[in-house]
C-alpha cells in the first residue's frame, strides 16, 4: 500500500485492523464526507514528457541546416527532453510522504495537491 490509500481520512490499513468501526457502511449520509485522495506524482508526467521530447529529437535529427522550422523543433525537443529528465530525477529522488487533496471534501476529485516534504 502507498500513502494514498485513505478512506474518510483514515488509512485503509487502520480501518481493516479495527473492524468494530462502522466506516465501511454503505449509508449515503456517511459517505458524503469522503475525500478522495488522488495518487498523482509529477513523475507520472515527467517520464512521458521525456520520451516525447526524445522521440521528437530523433524524428528531427537529420540535416537541420536547410530548414529553419526543423531546427527550431529540434532545439525545443532537446530542451523538453532535458527538462523532462530533470523533473523525473527531482520527483523520484524526493521524500514526499503526505500528499493530500485540499479543497472540496464532498467526495469529489480535486486537482490541488499539497506535498509536505522536508526537502521542498
Swiss-Prot record:
Bilayer-crossing residues are: 40-60, 72-92
* Keyword Membrane on entry: yes
Q: Which family does it belong to?
A: Belongs to the IIV-6 010R family.
Q: What is this protein called?
A: Transmembrane protein 010R
What is the membrane topology noted in the UniProt record heading this document?
Answer: Multi-pass membrane protein
- What subcellular compartments does it reside in? Membrane
Report one GO cellular component.
membrane
Give a yes or no for keyword Membrane in this entry.
yes
Q: Which domain of life is it from?
A: Viruses
Keywords attached to this Swiss-Prot or TrEMBL record, sorted alphabetically, are: Membrane, Transmembrane, Transmembrane helix
